Amino acid sequence: MRKIIHVDMDCFFAAVEMRDDPRLRDIPLAIGGSKERRGVISTANYPARRYGVRSAMPTAMAFKLCPQLTLLPGRMAAYKEASQHIREIFARYTPLIEPLSLDEAYLDVSDSLACGGSATLIAQEIRQSIASELNLTASAGIAPIKFLAKIASELNKPNGQYVITPNQIQPFLQDLPLSKIPGVGAVTAKRLQALGLVTCGDIQKYPLAELLKHFGKFGRVLWERSHGIDEREISPDRLRKSVGVEKTLAEDIYDWESCEALIEELYLELETRLRKVKPSLHIARQGVKLKFHDFQQTTQEHTWPVLNKVDLLEIAHAAWHERRAERGVRLVGLHVTLLDPQLERQLLLDWG
């Protein structure tokens, strides 16, 4: 069996700010966009979470829950510097590191000789090193598969770790809510519940054929995770699959001309970002997102070989007139999906 560690920093952005300014340590603190500009919360410290402040929450709502909240815009350079140091600590134990974001990563320590080969002790040492070298805390989950390692990292937060051994997998899964499986949101959970399926234990008694009938390919994922099967490898060279930019507006817009001007502005930023990862600007798809004042949204995409502003404007124009239904627009976003590297190489050969 493999030995997988999932390391998750504790309220990372806020923790960096509290470390660098101890006056922030015991007060409700959040990182995010201002309520005047209709921003959202990126992360919140534990004093703020006690008031119900959560990541991805509109900043205005956060202030309603916690009027005394201290809000900071964030310092991405500081967070990236800390993240790089953390990555260097991981590399002392294994080259098999799959970063998921600045503040979390999977590690495969199956072949590591450190700490006598004990994944539990390796996780403990990593957390101790992060604490002593960066004055930050991390939580960790240790399990034979990625799915359970990630769940385990949530069970002893903050500044703790949890181990699921091979012998503990089945007992652990029996009562595990299906909502813990990635991809099971509120809608899917409701459909599962209608079938009498609430826990992984319920799925274990349910025919795979029925799951496939009701949920298609995702039915197999549900069945496998509920049986403790997750064959996904750690991917050290995890490839970026998309690039996007978006802007939340200070006031809703109701006229196409304002949206068009914003898309012109966002396009320049998207092109700049894309050139950093794909100088040729070759892509697989490009698209537009509009979020309305009622928080519903529409995303429209076209298959397109190269980043193209005219096409993006046409997509946006169609979405504006077909999906808006006279609602105000509060957010506009542009994104591209990158080509699979093998496919891109083949296309270049074909074009050459």
UniProtKB/Swiss-Prot annotation:
Q: What is its main location?
A: cytoplasm
Q: Supply the Pfam families for this chain.
A: IMS (PF00817), IMS_C (PF11799), IMS_HHH_1 (PF21999)
Tell me which residues make up the UmuC domain: 4-185
Reactions catalysed, as given in the entry: DNA(n) + a 2'-deoxyribonucleoside 5'-triphosphate = DNA(n+1) + diphosphate
One GO cellular-component annotation of the UniProt record comes to:
cytoplasm
How does the cofactor attach, per the note?
Binds 2 magnesium ions per subunit.
Instruction: Write down the position(s) of the site called Substrate discrimination.
Output: F13
Q: Where does Mg(2+) bind?
A: D8, D103
What does the record note on quaternary structure?
Monomer.
Free-text function comment from the UniProt entry: Poorly processive, error-prone DNA polymerase involved in untargeted mutagenesis. Copies undamaged DNA at stalled replication forks, which arise in vivo from mismatched or misaligned primer ends. These misaligned primers can be extended by PolIV. Exhibits no 3'-5' exonuclease (proofreading) activity. May be involved in translesional synthesis, in conjunction with the beta clamp from PolIII.
Instruction: Specify the protein name.
Output: DNA polymerase IV
Origin species, per record, is Yersinia pestis
Which gene specifies this protein's sequence? dinB
